[in-house]
């Protein structure tokens, strides 16, 4: 409200100049209008520019005539007189204008609030089914995955218990006759009389060195030794030593945490055994591959290899 009246004051200052000509024919009507709202208009002829004193007609006109100019906190009466279209027209009290503008604002504001209240439920009603559908799908998928994971873990634990039981049985059997030898009776040939090729001797040396490094928890050095041994075994076309070198490479990579590369070398052991129709070392290869898949989190493949490993432990 204060902002509107200030704008009016500034407009009156900028308009300036002489007041518009007075319409004498409407003077009686102006007097009646001023008297009806409880104010009288007093004109001082000597002042320039002309202004009006607004004096209340119902209470002590003489006392108010001396100090009867209407005081307002917004703008001077002289500046408001310049803005008036007719000289000498009395003004309504400012609180009356404030009440009118306030009522108009109050009539407009509730409509906007009502429109906002009407729009909000529509958007929320449209969005709630979508949110509920997304939450329902997420809960369903999460429950299925958790149930599947739980079943795989239970199956894996059962397989590990079977492996431990088979290993304990095998250890008991071996403890009955630890010094029993199934080699034929005969004189042992001294090592000095055994003729070994230089490459074969180097191959055996690399395999022993690699095992020593594995035993000493040095898998990087063991990998280097087993790699050379594998190349020598392949050049000599010795499948038995080739499987030993491949098994050593898989073990060294497995201890370094390189499980996918380790699976490749353990699978090489299985391929050589299948090619040569010779089963030595494949039981350990199945168990090592299952361990690698377990570390990678692929429990389904790990379970398959554990099943094969358990079956071979029970038949060996």
Swiss-Prot record:
Segments forming a coiled coil: 144-175
Gene name of the encoded protein: FLU
Pfam families membership: TPR_12
Transit peptide: 1-26
Gene3D superfamilies to which the protein is assigned, alphabetical: Tetratricopeptide repeat domain (1.25.40.10)
Membrane topology according to the record: Single-pass membrane protein
Keyword Transferase assigned: no
Protein name (database record): Protein FLUORESCENT IN BLUE LIGHT, chloroplastic
Record note on quaternary structure: Part of the FLU-containing chloroplast membrane complex composed of FLU, CRD1, PORB, PORC, CHLP and HEMA1. Interacts with HEMA1 (via C-terminus) only in the absence of light. No interaction with HEMA2.
């Amino acid at each position: 409200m204060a902002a509107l009246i200030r704008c009016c004051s500034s407009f009156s200052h900028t308009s300036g100049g002489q007041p518009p000509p007075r319409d004498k024919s409407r003077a009686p009507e102006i007097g009646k209008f001023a008297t009806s709202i409880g104010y009288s208009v007093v004109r001082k002829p000597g002042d320039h520019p002309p202004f009006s004193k607004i004096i209340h007609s119902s209470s002590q006109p003489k006392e108010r005539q001396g100090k009867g100019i209407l005081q307002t906190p917004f703008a001077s009466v002289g500046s408001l007189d310049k803005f008036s279209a007719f000289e000498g027209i009395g003004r309504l009290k400012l609180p009356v204008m404030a009440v009118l503008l306030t009522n108009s604002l109050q009539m407009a504001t509730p409509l906007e609030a009502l429109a906002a209240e009407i729009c909000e439920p529509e958007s929320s009603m449209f969005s709630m089914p979508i949110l509920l559908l997304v939450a329902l799908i997420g809960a369903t998928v999460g429950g299925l995955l958790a149930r599947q994971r739980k079943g795989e873990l239970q199956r894996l634990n059962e397989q590990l218990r079977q492996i431990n039981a088979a290993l304990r049985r095998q250890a008991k059997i071996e403890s009955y006759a630890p010094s029993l030898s199934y080699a034929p009776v005969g004189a042992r040939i001294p090592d000095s009389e055994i003729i070994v090729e230089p490459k074969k001797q180097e191959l055996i040396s690399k395999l022993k060195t690699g095992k020593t490094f594995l035993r000493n928890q040095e898998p990087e050095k063991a990998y280097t030794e087993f790699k050379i041994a594998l190349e020598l075994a392949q050049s000599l076309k010795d499948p038995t030593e080739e499987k030993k070198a491949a098994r050593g490479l898989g073990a060294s990579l497995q201890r370094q945490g390189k499980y996918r590369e380790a699976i490749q070398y353990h699978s090489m052991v299985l391929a050589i055994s299948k090619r040569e129709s010779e089963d030595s070392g494949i039981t350990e290869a199945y168990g090592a591959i299952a361990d690698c898949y377990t570390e990678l989190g692929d429990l389904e493949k790990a379970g398959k290899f554990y099943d094969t490993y358990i079956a071979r432990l029970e038949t060996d």
